[in-house]
Amino acid sequence: MKNLFNLFLMFFFAMPILSLSENPTNFSESCEDGSGETGSSFGIGFDLVLDFGLYRNSCPEAESIVYSWVETTVLEDPRMAASLLRLHFHDCFVNGCDASVLLDDTEGLVGEKTAPPNLNSLRGFEVIDSIKSDIESVCPETVSCADILAMAARDSVVVSGGPRWEVEVGRKDSRTASKQAATNGLPSPNSTVSTLISTFQNLGLSQTDMVALSGGHTLGKARCTSFTARLQPLQTGQPANHGDNLEFLESLQQLCSTVGPSVGITQLDLVTPSTFDNQYYVNLLSGEGLLPSDQALAVQDPGTRAIVETYATDQSVFFEDFKNAMVKMGGIPGGSNSEIRKNCRMIN
């Protein structure tokens, strides 16, 4: 298991950030601390009640097993932090946080892995498999794959220098998955701010949650095909959009024209690509957001612009809002047709 041209390497929402690999997705209100008290309940779909301390007695080794695998994997491949974070995003945004994104296709089930936003883009499945195997060996049929995704996402942020939060657990794993739901439900890297706000609100997430979760794009990479629209002023000879950094766009165009749009890849954050920090927002204010949907946060809406400015100047505010938004997103419930899988790739 176990300088401007140096942007050229891969990419998630997703992200995504987010790795927030090839087609990142753009992603609270205060949450309780880790007291062991009953946690979130979402009024969306099947009612889900989560608990901060569910596994303290039934599987006390669970969190340490997850952290050990994430730490080792990210040390070997820093991009994996974004990949694991993005897996959790893409899971929760499609019919809730139910590990449906992990199901392999079968003769009777065409799931989310082959949906356009995920195909040849999501990664990290083997890491989740390894974590699940180790946990099953000590606590069989106790810890859900959906909870593993939530803990692995948190630990990916932590080992990358970001904040830690208590993860509520008690999710169940879906026995179904939907390619169409993934195709229709995941935001595009070309989404406008109004579309993003609507998408997040439909899941019970606020505008602040959306801007905070988009900060996951401080990690990961993206293919040229994900940000072609950012290069349009250079390609068409039209005036640059408000907030565009022409030097930045020219460097991207050089990359994509040299190696080809389907091959060219670059960091979502060129300054601190493997560190979870607030540099993503600083980049947006200087016109160096990679994805159209990222740069839009700083130029299309005064409300999101104000949040971007706050996060760019105060990392502690970003960290606090990100933690709260992750807990809130992690409480989006799945359906009632669920179980605790023995193998995350297939139903029992």
From Swiss-Prot:
Protein residues bound to heme b: H217
GO BP term (any one): response to oxidative stress
Co-factor remark: Binds 1 heme b (iron(II)-protoporphyrin IX) group per subunit.
UniProt KW keywords: Calcium, Disulfide bond, Glycoprotein, Heme, Hydrogen peroxide, Iron, Metal-binding, Oxidoreductase, Peroxidase, Secreted, Signal
Entry-linked InterPro entries: Haem_peroxidase (IPR002016), Haem_peroxidase_sf (IPR010255), Peroxidase_pln (IPR000823), Peroxidases_AS (IPR019794), Peroxidases_heam-ligand_BS (IPR019793), Secretory_peroxidase (IPR033905)
The keyword Mitochondrion appears for this protein: no
Subcellular location: Secreted
One Pfam family it belongs to: peroxidase
Cofactor(s) listed: heme b; Ca(2+)
UniProt-annotated glycosylation sites, renumbered to this chain: N26, N190
Gene3D superfamilies: 1.10.520.10, Peroxidase, domain 2
Binding site for Ca(2+) 2: T218, D269, T272, D277
Documented EC number(s): 1.11.1.7
Region annotation Disordered: where it falls in the sequence: 170-189
Active site: H90
Residue ranges, compositional bias (Polar residues): 177-189
Binding positions (Ca(2+) 1): D91, V94, G96, D98, S100
UniProt enzyme class: oxidoreductase
Main subcellular localisation: secreted
Miscellaneous comment in the UniProt entry for this protein: There are 73 peroxidase genes in A.thaliana.
Protein name: Peroxidase 40
Organism: Arabidopsis thaliana
